[in-house]
Amino acid sequence: KRPVSKTSESPKNQSERRFAQIMNTADVVEIFSSIQGEGPHIGERHLFLRLCGCNLRCSFCDTPFDKTEKAAVYTNNGISYLKNPVSTGKLAEEINNFNNINHSYLSITGGEPLLHHKFLKDLIPMIHLPVYLETNGTLYHELEDIINLVSVISADIKLPSSTGLKPFFD
């Protein structure tokens, strides 16, 4: 589980952080609660945040990751929508409103969520859940930026022979 920082901020830093929460945005596909179906936490209830965009174009991929006008938020009360792009502050508020259901993790997925590493660096500290990051593992420099904020990394490495793409690493 992710440690909670108890450092105090100066009023100037608090103001700058609030401004960043409004100005830092990302396009979101959907937010939903479901049972994790892969990896070491299979069978646990996770809250899923699916972000737009991917740096790969795997021939077999069926995941919607194109930008959409609205992000779908699926709850027990039905579906609501957020206008894209969504700010870190608004998204944190939506995610933290799911606290009425006991989730083990916030699973951040895509597409490729590390395309939004700067956004995630601001968002994750505002979330009241440990983070399970699903990634294709190709954006390792971006991962360095947020690795200390993430509890679990699930890297789904794609082999060139299965994707039809060129090798990612030498």
Question: What annotation goes with each model-predicted range?
Answer:
Residues 37-38, 94-97, 141-144:
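Short, flexible, glycine/charge-rich loop motifs used to bind or transfer phosphoryl groups or to couple energy/partner
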Residues 2-10:
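Low-acidity, Ser/Thr- and Arg-rich intrinsically disordered low-complexity segments
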Residues 103-105, 110, 114-170:
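Conserved AdoMet/S-adenosylmethionine-binding subsite of the radical SAM
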Residues 66-78, 85-99, 105-107, 111-132:
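N-terminal active-site wall of soluble small-molecule enzyme domains
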Residues 26-90:
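Canonical Radical SAM [4Fe-4S] cluster-binding loop centered on the CxxxCxxC motif
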